[in-house]
Swiss-Prot record:
GO cellular component: cytosol
Protein name per the record: Putrescine N-methyltransferase 1
Pfam family for this entry, one: Spermine_synth
Gene Ontology molecular function: putrescine N-methyltransferase activity
UniProt keyword Amino-acid biosynthesis present: no
Enzyme class name: transferase
Catalytic activity annotation: putrescine + S-adenosyl-L-methionine = N-methylputrescine + S-adenosyl-L-homocysteine + H(+)
Similarity section: Belongs to the class I-like SAM-binding methyltransferase superfamily. Putrescine methyltransferase family.
Catalytic residues (UniProt): D242
Induction info: Down-regulated by auxin. Accumulates upon the removal of flower heads and young leaves. Triggered by jasmonic acid (MeJA).
Expression by tissue: Predominantly expressed in roots.
A Gene Ontology BP annotation from the UniProt entry: response to auxin
Amino acid sequence: MEVISTNTNGSTIFKNGAIPMNGHQNGTSEHLNGYQNGTSKHQNGHQNGTFEHRNGHQNGTSEQQNGTISHDNGNELLGSSDSIKPGWFSEFSALWPGEAFSLKVEKLLFQGKSDYQDVMLFESATYGKVLTLDGAIQHTENGGFPYTEMIVHLPLGSIPNPKKVLIIGGGIGFTLFEMLRYPSIEKIDIVEIDDVVVDVSRKFFPYLAANFNDPRVTLVLGDGAAFVKAAQAGYYDAIIVDSSDPIGPAKDLFERPFFEAVAKALRPGGVVCTQAESIWLHMHIIKQIIANCRQVFKGSVNYAWTTVPTYPTGVIGYMLCSTEGPEVDFKNPVNPIDKETTQVKSKLGPLKFYNSDIHKAAFILPSFARSMIES
């Protein structure tokens, strides 16, 4: 494995798997419990008996914008980077107003703030380890496999013999794990903006991080949008954009200039698959993504969806596009991975969710979504 750091903003690249358990960076020291003048002034701002959380709790008000952990007795609500006690994690966001998703927390494994976002990992009672970024669930160890298998196998199952692939995001390693099922692949570049996410993988998901050492893999710590813009034209067979929601550090990955750079980096008939939100909540975002893609990609533009139990509304969507060149029929896989060799199965284990029938069904949309997407 080759590791390249492209961070230029003074961020710390942690070596040998070291992780700052309290989020201290850049030589600063901010005690979590910071007692001063008899008051309790926490990192999230408890002062004089009031709560002034990062996400807006003050004097008994509740304006949660991000995930929080609360105690079982319900009398105290603590910010995601302020509690190390078992309780309940609740996911709040302006992207899904009026609803929340909660998980029982067995143990808080890691909490910290990188140069880009709040990072938290905890052991849940039902889904194993859970990774959150800025309070939003990104992946669960025992419930996230539908998302990962589909974001990899929908595009790669639609082209014959993919050889050069780029992953944007995916610093934990689940996406890479699935990609290694394809024996034709010769080169995998992974661009992860947040080095803390990679360090969390090394410490808590060593079986995934071990794949970063595969000789076909180059791990780049840097900005995915900038990397694609600088990529050699026509180099990649496929690009997988395993991003978080279109806010914060991932916002640029949903804009037209990014898609233009992706199209340039793909070979004729190359494919891209990107996370594309939920049809139940984000049709306005989906329509904008589709409009951008239709202006850029001259092959085909498709929307697919699947079920993920720990994502808002229980579903997530994908944009699948191809560049002009050899025709790509995303709805009918030509390289079905569910017929993989016994050797691959013995090394990586069987697929848990994806199969050729699921692949085809992913493009069948409810009437309301189909009419809006096709309009």
